[in-house]
């Protein structure tokens, strides 16, 4: 959850969607008791205890609230969650070897909470799980005979939570679940597949991605199962929204606040970013990247095109973290061209806002993109996105009006989009018109909340 811990877009979504849904229902969030969360929550009240079973240790469930009063349950088990690094791996980026235990313990407790067995004062009408880390929740409900409806949202099908066959015993799952119509996936246990099989309904974070994952190209080996769920009208795409407090007219983190048409204010932010990153004074376009630095995001395509972008008069600024090899490649590129490439490894909220505000274009050459948030924030700040025509990028970028789309995740196709951006930059009237159109777009969470609320009511029959 973005209030306490952020890993990719999932943290932002799990913070924003519950708040948007508060007018419709009694929404409560459950999180593992990660170190960062425990340090920031105060007045945690123990409401229930989970005994050990299989290889899952005993734990306690605490209840607290966010600063704005949103109820939060936290699973307290220091041996599983009180660790350095990120929620999924150690400080060197390696996955924790007991991630099957860590997330099975969480999912089992979430199922117990939903069934009314942990907090005596509350039970759920419906439970909404997200990604492989919570995908066992619908499975545990089914194995315990609960009739509670459940939703699984797939934020990225490529992350499946795969573990050795012995994990089945370790997490207390029935042996009968290890088959092609259960958790088995090429002789491994797939946590994600558990949710795909047992959840009452599946959602993804854009309609385009919902269609894409039923194909072999994007289905990651699960397209057959997903086609069955889609054909049964049990797979829905609901586009994510963004935090609308990210507004260039009011962001205190900017060098100068600005609105549509105030290009002097936008230039002031560009000058600030250039100075911050040690880039040369330039009248050329600045290309920003705010992303996880992983293969999926097409960072290698940016690296392969960097010299051509710079030789044409452009500059590149990057912030994000991810695969060590890509991080190092970006650092090396900066060292070769320190006047034209700026790199900040790690995610910083203020830094991201400043890059969106200062850049003329935002590069998003993702090989696939279930939804994507950066292209929506970029438009809000007048930074026109250049994106591969896939997933949420295809739904949120209007080609030639609020940004640029290219057809294939290849060097030449990507450069084609970049060249169109250069042409627009040289045509001031076109650039101004596109910026105004982009900054006028609305990506409110209220639209997503309406869709989820309707789905909740349908499944819970309330």
Curated annotation (Swiss-Prot):
Pathway annotation: Glycan biosynthesis; glycogen biosynthesis
Molecular function terms, GO-annotated: alpha-1,4-glucan glucosyltransferase (ADP-glucose donor) activity; alpha-1,4-glucan glucosyltransferase (UDP-glucose donor) activity
Segments crossing the lipid bilayer: none
A Pfam short name: Glycos_transf_1
Keyword Glycosyltransferase applies: yes
Binding positions for ADP-alpha-D-glucose per the UniProt entry: 6
GO biological process, one term: glycogen biosynthetic process
SUPFAM superfamilies the record matches: UDP-Glycosyltransferase/glycogen phosphorylase
Keywords: Glycogen biosynthesis, Glycosyltransferase, Transferase
EC top class named in words: transferase
Top-level division of the source organism's lineage: Bacteria
Catalyzed chemical reaction(s): [(1->4)-alpha-D-glucosyl](n) + ADP-alpha-D-glucose = [(1->4)-alpha-D-glucosyl](n+1) + ADP + H(+)
Enzyme nomenclature, EC number: 2.4.1.21
Reported function: Synthesizes alpha-1,4-glucan chains using ADP-glucose.
Family: Belongs to the glycosyltransferase 1 family. Bacterial/plant glycogen synthase subfamily.
Protein name: Glycogen synthase 1
Taxonomic source organism: Bradyrhizobium diazoefficiens (strain JCM 10833 / BCRC 13528 / IAM 13628 / NBRC 14792 / USDA 110)
Phylogenetic classification of the source organism: Bacteria, Pseudomonadati, Pseudomonadota, Alphaproteobacteria, Hyphomicrobiales
